Amino acid sequence: MDVMKENKMKNIDEYLYKYGLHDCVVERIYVQNNSLVFCFGKGVYNLNENGTETTKTTACLMYLEIENLNKEQMWEHIEISKINKNKINEIDYEKFIEEVNKYKFDILENYLSYFGNSVLLEGYTSKNRYQIKISEISKIEFNFK
């Protein structure tokens, strides 16, 4: 295994065993440089060595760094599915961001995959249920306030 891929996996492992996003609220999502940034105004959960949620952190930003992220071609790395009465439709990144920034995004589940270095977040706004898959993540970083 090459060193770069090993470092990416180590970074994802660090995140996976350190923080939980279940029942956390994303208040805003935006792009900064090569990162997709999620704003958690009420923090995320610290996980103990068994993966159990313990305490909540302070407000934080989660940076999902994606090499060569192009704001005009977000579909290359981000797939968003809107689930409504058992119908699944793919929607634009811009429409999803607009809804999140207006209503917030409550995360029910978060999944990680080494294949494609992906994160899948499942949750809802006050209007709809969504799944958002972000792939080719080179680094995950949390910045606490």
What name fits each language-model region?
Residues 2-145:
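Surface-exposed, interaction-prone regions used to assemble/regulate multi-protein complexes
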